[in-house]
Amino acid sequence: MIEILKDKRGSSPIFTAIIVLVFSLIISTVMYIAYVEIQTTVIRNAMKTGLANLAYTISEDTYTALRESDFEEYVAKLTGESAYRTKLENTYKGDIANSIDTSTSEYTVDSIRLSFTRDGMKIRYTCTCDVTFYVRLFGINMPATAKSVQVEGSHTAKYG
């Protein structure tokens, strides 16, 4: 192989072209993986921002619920299916949509979900979404990879 590369007569243009092509593909793959990681970080940061806004709303509502002595009812409303929970989910989805584009030609953010759990006087919330990345091949956007992004938060309801 080294003899072919040292050949001065020009008899190795196909071999050289293949090597250049392989290196180009490797560089393209590395750049695409870096792009996916960067975009995933951007989406995760947008989710964290939305989560901070959501945490403020939940904290404020928890304080009100504790003052009115119906914390158990509030937790049941938060962890079960209710209009209040739907309102929180829609607010969260709106915060994410205001921070980033949820659908572009490079990726789509789907299935934004919120789940709430109670651990003593602590309310935990988990936000999850699925991100599908696309590659344009021959004029058609093809799904290349899918990632699940998850962000968690909590606050302790100690206002006593």
Regions found by a protein language model. Give the residues of each.
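Alpha-helical assembly-interface signal, strongest on the long, hydrophobic N-terminal helix that forms
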Residues: I2-A83
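Short, conserved structural patches
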Residues: T41, E60-G160
